[in-house]
């Protein structure tokens, strides 16, 4: 079902700031036109929402691929294969994420992504690029190919920004590397989100990076200097510094439930951003897949390189939301913060992350068990599930 104008009746509208029950929501021309009780309108398609909840569409700030597609493929159809898969899990917007590779490969990916940002009618929207690698630590490389890891270089970043049409919104880097702190400051001043990740920084180096503008931690706990009582490391810095938002991959593989609970208690919902870090095997059968020229084995235990290193995930955003609720018993309002609102704030979006009149009509309808029933993008029902 595809609507140009839609009213959802008698639904509970949930935002980060609270909820309103038994509301009608009128979506028109891609925007939220009105939220009120008993909206009267003629010639408008209607959807009954009794007993269900309307949440802002999920925003995934860290996703490499799905359905055999990867951002680094630099193909014409790549993002247009990816978009229809992510929207099925309630993700209405995302950052296409890269990984460490040769500069030539990066050049192609930046150029191709910059040319393919207009979504088709059944796709999630690409908000921009998240550059993960090559400016990371070889000591914390994980699945990032060692041969292509280099020191942060602002001239290279400026070239990529130009090739992408100024679409780079976030960069993961290791600030302790040579030129790292200068890059943190320069990027932050230019409006790019600096996320500390794949980093062996000390706690003190972490604090310095935050003072220079770093505001996020890439997939907390994974491939970062761990906590020690004499050196809290990057993990300690992400957990303790309020100015840092923590990305979490809540798939029961990348971290223990207790580690998720600890992050929730220390950061609170205001300090957490749920991500998938998904790779091309998402939405595909178990088997062998490629990640940056490396063989990845995908099983029920996750995605791993031959050496055992985790290589992204096959997590979906709706499952991440359910997992977070299961572990922490957090409220729906808190889930909105962690799945959309915080990401929108980080990206300085003034049209997403909230269900408010004038905002984009991007939303999901879920039941009391957080099972997805509909995904709405630009006021149209793009996905209707059998839940």
From Swiss-Prot:
It comes from the Bacteria. Its EC number is 3.5.1.25. GO terms for biological process: N-acetylglucosamine catabolic process; N-acetylneuraminate catabolic process. It is an enzyme of class 3 (hydrolase). Binds 2 divalent metal cations per subunit. Its cofactor is a divalent metal cation. A divalent metal cation 1 binds at residues 62, 64, 132, 277. The active site is at residue 277. Induction: By N-acetylglucosamine. SUPFAM superfamilies: Composite domain of metallo-dependent hydrolases (SSF51338), Metallo-dependent hydrolases (SSF51556). Substrate binds at residues 143-144, 222-223, 230, 251-254, 310-312. Gene3D superfamilies: Metal-dependent hydrolases (3.20.20.140), Urease, subunit C, domain 1 (2.30.40.10). Pathway: Amino-sugar metabolism; N-acetylneuraminate degradation; D-fructose 6-phosphate from N-acetylneuraminate: step 4/5. A divalent metal cation 2 binds at residues 132, 198, 219. Keywords: Carbohydrate metabolism, Hydrolase, Metal-binding. Pfam families: Amidohydro_1 (PF01979). Coiled coil: none annotated. Involved in the first committed step in the biosynthesis of amino-sugar-nucleotides. Catalyzes the hydrolysis of the N-acetyl group of N-acetylglucosamine-6-phosphate (GlcNAc-6-P) to yield glucosamine 6-phosphate and acetate. Homodimer. This is N-acetylglucosamine-6-phosphate deacetylase. It comes from Lysinibacillus sphaericus (Bacillus sphaericus).
């Amino acid at each position: 079902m595809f609507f140009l104008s839609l009213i959802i009746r008698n639904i509970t509208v949930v935002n980060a700031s609270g909820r309103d029950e038994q509301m009608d929501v009128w979506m028109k021309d891609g925007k939220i036109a009105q939220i009120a009780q008993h909206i009267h309108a003629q010639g408008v398609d209607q959807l009954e929402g009794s007993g269900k909840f309307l949440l802002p569409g999920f925003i995934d700030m860290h996703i490499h691929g799905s359905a055999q597609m990867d951002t680094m493929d630099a193909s014409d159809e790549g993002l247009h294969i990816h978009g229809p898969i992510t929207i099925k899990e309630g993700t209405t917007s995302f950052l296409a994420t890269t990984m460490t590779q040769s500069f030539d490969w990066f050049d192609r990916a930046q150029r191709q992504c910059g040319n393919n940002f207009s979504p088709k009618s059944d796709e999630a929207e690409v908000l921009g690029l998240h550059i993960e690698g090559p400016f990371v630590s070889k000591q914390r490389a994980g699945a990032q190919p060692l041969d292509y890891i280099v020191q942060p270089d602002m001239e290279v970043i400026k070239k990529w920004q130009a090739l992408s049409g100024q679409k780079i919104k976030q960069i993961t880097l290791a600030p302790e590397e040579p030129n790292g702190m200068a890059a943190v400051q320069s990027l932050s001043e230019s409006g790019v989100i600096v996320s500390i990740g794949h980093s062996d920084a000390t706690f003190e180096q972490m604090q310095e990076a935050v003072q220079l503008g770093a505001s996020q931690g890439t997939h907390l706990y994974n491939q970062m200097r761990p906590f020690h009582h004499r050196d809290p490391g990057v993990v300690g810095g992400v957990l303790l510094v309020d100015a840092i938002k923590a990305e979490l991959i809540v798939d029961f593989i990348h971290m223990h439930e207790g580690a998720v609970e600890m992050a929730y208690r220390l950061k609170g919902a205001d300090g957490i951003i749920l991500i998938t870090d998904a790779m091309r095997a998402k939405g595909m059968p178990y088997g062998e897949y490629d990640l940056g020229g490396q063989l990845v084995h995908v099983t029920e235990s996750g995605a791993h390189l031959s050496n055992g290193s985790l290589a992204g995930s096959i997590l979906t955003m709706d499952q991440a939301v359910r997992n977070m609720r299961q572990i922490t018993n957090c409220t729906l309002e808190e889930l909105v913060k962690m799945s959309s609102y915080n990401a929108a704030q980080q990206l300085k979006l003034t049209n997403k992350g909230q269900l408010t009149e004038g905002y984009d009509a991007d939303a999901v309808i879920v039941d009391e068990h957080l099972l997805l029933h509909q995904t709405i993008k630009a006021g149209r029902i793009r996905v209707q599930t059998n839940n």
